[in-house]
Amino acid sequence: MMNAIPVKPTGTRWTDNQWKSIYAKGQDILVAAAAGSGKTAVLVERIIQRIIRDEIDVDKLLVVTFTNASAREMKQRVDQRIQEASIENPDNAHLKNQRVKIHQAQISTLHSFCLKLIQQHYDVLDIDPNFRTSSEAENILLLEQTIDEVLERHYDILDPHFIDLTEQLSSDRNDDQLRNTIKEMYYFSVANPNPLNWLQHLSTPYEDESQQETLFNLLNDLAMIFMNSALEALNKSYDLFMMLEEVDKQVAVLDKERRFLAEAMEGGLLNTQKIAEHQFESRFPAKNKKIKEANEMMIDAYDDGKKHYDDYKALVSKVQEDYFSREAADLKTDMQRLAPRVAYLAQVTADVIEQFNQKKRSRNLLDFSDYEHFALRILMDSNGNPSEIADMYRKQFEEILVDEYQDTNRVQEKIIACIKRGDEADGNLFMVGDVKQSIYKFRQADPSLFIGKYNRFTLDGSEHGMRIDLSQNFRSREEVLTTTNYLFKHMMDEAVGEIVYDDAAQLYYGAPFDHKPHDVQLNMLIEDASSDLNGSEQEAEYIVQQVEKIMSQHEIYDIKTEQYRKPSYKDIVILERSYGQARKIQQAFKDHNIPFHVNSKEGYFEQTEVQLILSFLRTIDNPLQDIYLVGLMRSVIYQFTEDELSNIRVFSPNDDYFYQSIKHYMANDVANKKLVAKLASFLEDIEQYQDYSQSHPVYQLIDKFYNDHYVIQYFSGIIGGKGRRANLYGLFNKAVEFENSSFRGLYQFIRFIDELIERGKDFGEENIVGPNDDVVRMMTIHSSKGLEFPFVIYSGLSRKFRRDDLHRPVILNQSYGLGMAYYDVESNLSYPSLSSVTYKAIAEKEMVSEEMRLIYVALTRAKEQLFLIGRVKDEKTLSQFEQVSVSESHLPVSYRITAQRPIDMIYPILAKYQSSSLPNELRFEQTIEDVDQAMRPYVQLNTDFYEDIASETVTDVSEQRTVADIEMNHSKNEALQAQIHNQLSYEYPYQSAIEKPSKQSVSELKRQHETEQSDTNYDRVRQYRIGSTSYERPAFLSRSKQRKANEIGTLMHTVMQHLPFNKDRLTEEDVNRLVDHLIAQHIIPEDAKQDIRFDDIYNFIASDLYQLIAESDEIYRELPFVVNQNEVDHNKHSEEDASIIQGMIDLIFVKEGQYYFVDYKTDAFNRRRNMSDEEIGAQLRERYKVQMNHYRNTLETILKTDVKGFLYFFKFGQLSIEG
């Protein structure tokens, strides 16, 4: 039963839910702590209050953290708070005792707690108390050795089921696939409380028809997601083609597909036979002549209809290929055939577990998995119930507090369950975590444990346990939070993401930043196919440019001083999913002389200096390995040239090994004497090192090679010397660590290295950069978890998700078991089984869910500003993103499951919000009002072409040409001039069809209206419109001191765009500071001050309109729009081709639900003698009547509500615009 929570005093820094998290007790409590919500501070404060307020000894609390570093930090924080409390209450004996007991406090990782448990109760386990923890190298080699021996034993027995298994999972060359499968099954099984029991039940679904039926229903539900999307796409296609004429062939194809879907989906259960046998038309009928010559709207309708058909076809094909390439009966039949193989594979893995454990016991070794399983053996009796020792710990610990609970696995959950008190309704377990940041499934973390409690527990604690949501974020600016919220509102739900992103899950702004806008930047790079750089290299250059912009144009707000400062390189971090592109990014920063560091866990073995030493070690172990032998000879140590190596090979081209060729060359009388001497010296070296390796450990062999050839000195003296030296010492230290294990010798060390390389597990380059070094850092999203940075560049959004696990021969799932295809030994063909297709479908959904959570972690690292970097091959891809359909306020489930990259989800969501031209069915919301303030994204979508970026860094040769050069060139190209003249003089035969423009700005409509009233020919207006296009002024003109009127107008609009609206009005000093800031940020030119009309701005600040805006509820600036003119004119049924109206509204504000727009005018006008203000106002209203009407009608069309407006003339004042 929940105990009373003390009343929160006024003025406390804790939020209501933080306060509740600190003091609630009496039942199990789950704190769902969103990113940046201060969970660590809350956890420490809870511990302190349990000690001070409840007078619980600190050693009566068990605090479990995810890492040793977190445990150390938490213990230090608790110790510091106890000291502070002791100083405040010097006579408090309880606090004095805690100063002593803090050193025995159980604040540690669960592994550390398990280790202590084993050390205290080793007698229960019947193990030697002098055990030691195995090293990584030792564990890897010992497991490899165990698998070798177990497989050898089964090869001797040659059971028929084992033969079938090896036929399925081995190749003609080796059984690596079988070995890797056994290893994966080993790691999966030991993540369960009872590994052997888990293995034993793997074959049950293959034998039990009721479980097979359950699997089929699960697969049917997953496939139905795609079939429903296919039905929707087909209906859209059908509706569009039914609008067109002379498309009978196309409609016939669609009718056939509609009949197929009706039969395949009848009754809600998919007809797998129909799906498996269905064949599409080989080609969709092409457009006929009439369609090709139809108007643009009809052609667009045809193209859209064809696209929907293609989408339909892709969705059904997905179901055919991945789910039901065979009908249900066949899928189930092969399950029965697979049962013996699965059972035998499970038995082989069980044999590996048993023998691996025996090997570890004989060496008196324990690994981290043993920690957990031995702890369970201590805490559970033979019946699986808590033991007497577990009861003892239940009585000892008043409360168990678990940090990062979302990363718990099933074994750890069982350990905690053994030592906690009571049930969920009256327990003493306090858990903190965020399932949206559960990104360690590859370590067997099980987010379903968190999700289960999240769904069971209630906010009032009336049933089961209590759930408390910490949603207020104290890390990031509002723009980061609201944009993240908006993305995940439309991206994450129970279907994909495994949790609903609702009001409870979203982030709420709580940091004391100022209100200067810091929009999230979504920067899309369009690749240049003609560039010498590939797409990844172009993106690396794009990232460098972004860093340069941050350094030159941005500032950082210091919350403590409430002042801005210039950024340093260390304020910038680049986050990527992996280190796959780290080398290219590193090279780009090197090319631009920007300090950069990547503490990569990948690429260590690819470093030149490391490859040299590994080639040396492999050659000493076995010189009959050509790649390593030749690599060593060509290295800087021995410096054999390619000509020398080719001469050696030419002498004996038929030798199997290059080592033999060396011997034969040296024995040849006509060989080059100088080269023979060089080879003799080299072989003498090799033989000496081989002799040395027989009697010395590996690390001494490496050390001798370093000293003999001055390896450290050489690599220290070249570019990147500090890092290279660290890498060489790192390899030496690994050799020392290896020799301290139970394995010895050069061969075993090389095998250890090979296993690491094969598993993709690098040592990582040695870290030579400290936290205060001023460098741009690159790290993976995983390594950034728990950290925060002022500027985050989240790049690599266009790189594909890792789907390797979906293509493994065996797919494992903690909840469902093992899925594998059926291999027919006789026909040498493989067929999908019910388990293989179902588990693959589940794995695909879980994979995308984890990738979503990685995106969430990346976005929420940013404090000041977030930059998203994507890359596409052409603009068409971006347009296609906008056309992605919408389903129940989300991207369709089928679309999300099959998403290939982060950008596939991020761009469509943000682009749809930004676009004002999409039809309603492609939008998430119809109006701005539909978006809650906490969900409203503040984002700028920027599209850049790499060719433009590249040109910025290349000197423009044309600037160096003289007038004489141009004149000379002009005289030499008369033929070319004639050709150009003919092309430019070409007259379009269908000129009348384009007299009406397809797109017009509001200003153009205004000019058209004015010319119609004055009988001006429309051709003249059109000519004027084209001729008045504004181009950037050339460099020699832009140096002119005097700006033109239109340039001053643009300058004034820019200042007004950034002008703050304060209720107590800005001072002249405030305006001057604003202008200085705009100049410093390169938003306006340095010489702008001389042309800014400050008096006009001061007058505006003093106006009633300024005050009205300042007191409004919401303000939006510089809003672009593109709308259909027929919709604005309420003429939707017009058969005429509609024009598109585009424009930019200076400002919109909302006050008490009423929308207003404001249009600033810098126009000069003549005040005639004796004209009153009313007459001038009427004249100005008339002049801008058309433009303002279009603004108002456009906004009313978009917002679906009444809109009023104001014209503000800097030389006159405000004029209201109403309907």
UniProtKB/Swiss-Prot annotation:
GO terms for molecular function: 3'-5' DNA helicase activity; 3'-5' exonuclease activity; ATP binding; ATP hydrolysis activity; double-stranded DNA binding. Its cofactor is Mg(2+). GO terms for cellular component: cytosol; DNA helicase complex. SUPFAM superfamilies: P-loop containing nucleoside triphosphate hydrolases (SSF52540), Restriction endonuclease-like (SSF52980). Its EC number is 3.1.-.-, 5.6.2.4. The keyword Nucleotide-binding applies. Residues 1004-1016 have a biased composition (Basic and acidic residues). One of its GO terms (biological process) is double-strand break repair via homologous recombination. Residues 12-477 form the UvrD-like helicase ATP-binding domain. It catalyses: Couples ATP hydrolysis with the unwinding of duplex DNA by translocating in the 3'-5' direction; ATP + H2O = ADP + phosphate + H(+). Residues 997-1016 are annotated as: Disordered. Residues 478-786 form the UvrD-like helicase C-terminal domain. The heterodimer acts as both an ATP-dependent DNA helicase and an ATP-dependent, dual-direction single-stranded exonuclease. Recognizes the chi site generating a DNA molecule suitable for the initiation of homologous recombination. The AddA nuclease domain is required for chi fragment generation; this subunit has the helicase and 3' -> 5' nuclease activities. Belongs to the helicase family. AddA subfamily. Heterodimer of AddA and AddB/RexB. This is ATP-dependent helicase/nuclease subunit A.
